[in-house]
């Protein structure tokens, strides 16, 4: 078994959709990035890649490559999971935390878990997503961005 940790952060800006955990969340601001900027799925992808010593999301999907402009992060996560499967691993469990002052993430977490479990070919009871604020401290607390942390346990088949 192997453990991986992932972290990602994206700036909130006008004129972009807010997509977190594969869910389109109504909000006046969205996350800025080369792809759809799904901060949670990027952190999860990095955690899986790290557990398997396969580098990071930037190595596999560089922001200099036009193929990934506006890319669906769910498709990227599925590709990462295919790499894990080819190496003989499946998800043991995932624990992830979204750090956002607003909008509130709690109403969207059940659908996020459903999407993530499907993309990782795992039972939903192996996928945990939670959200917290920073009590209005720092960039997240000021509403300038959203961060996410993820820890995965990958098990050999």
Curated annotation (Swiss-Prot):
GO molecular function: 2-C-methyl-D-erythritol 2,4-cyclodiphosphate synthase activity; metal ion binding
NCBIfam families for the chain: ispF
Protein name (Swiss-Prot/TrEMBL): 2-C-methyl-D-erythritol 2,4-cyclodiphosphate synthase
Protein species of origin: Geobacter sulfurreducens (strain ATCC 51573 / DSM 12127 / PCA)
Key words, A-Z: Isoprene biosynthesis, Lyase, Metal-binding
Database matches in Gene3D superfamilies: 2-C-methyl-D-erythritol 2,4-cyclodiphosphate synthase
EC number: 4.6.1.12
Function statement: Involved in the biosynthesis of isopentenyl diphosphate (IPP) and dimethylallyl diphosphate (DMAPP), two major building blocks of isoprenoid compounds. Catalyzes the conversion of 4-diphosphocytidyl-2-C-methyl-D-erythritol 2-phosphate (CDP-ME2P) to 2-C-methyl-D-erythritol 2,4-cyclodiphosphate (ME-CPP) with a corresponding release of cytidine 5-monophosphate (CMP).
GO biological process: isopentenyl diphosphate biosynthetic process, methylerythritol 4-phosphate pathway; terpenoid biosynthetic process
Record flagged with keyword Glycosyltransferase: no
Site (Transition state stabilizer) residue list: 34, 133
Family per record: Belongs to the IspF family.
Catalytic reaction list: 4-CDP-2-C-methyl-D-erythritol 2-phosphate = 2-C-methyl-D-erythritol 2,4-cyclic diphosphate + CMP
CDD domains reported in the protein's UniProt record: MECDP_synthase (cd00554)
